[in-house]
């Protein structure tokens, strides 16, 4: 998937979050040592009911350590938030809907 397709999918997801009446933020991370501090800063900025973690973090086998680090950072920084997983950028609202009240 190209960066262009990812950003287009994120734009669709943000529209779908808004249509459901939910406030949403995008927190992009790099696949390096800056990922965990970036997640921690984002989650410290306010309270979240759900955090959706995209396939770009979850799926590459070489990214398993990054995935574990991100999950643990979310768990520590937002212990009350549900954790959801999308299958593509534009279904993030559906992923959150599985865990958030209608």
Task: Please report, for each region that a protein language model flagged, where it lies by residue.
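Mid-chain, well-packed structural core segment of small domains
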Residues: 37-75
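Short, well-structured hydrophobic secondary-structure segments
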Residues: 9-29
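Ser/Thr/Gly-rich flexible loops in soluble cytosolic domains mediating phosphotransfer, phosphorylation
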Residues: 9, 69-102
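Catalytic-face loop-and-helix region of soluble metabolic enzyme cores
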Residues: 27, 62, 82
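Structural motif
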Residues: 32-40, 93
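Glycine- and acidic-residue-enriched helix-capping/strand-helix junction motifs
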Residues: 1-9
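Short beta->alpha junction loops
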Residues: 25-34, 86-89
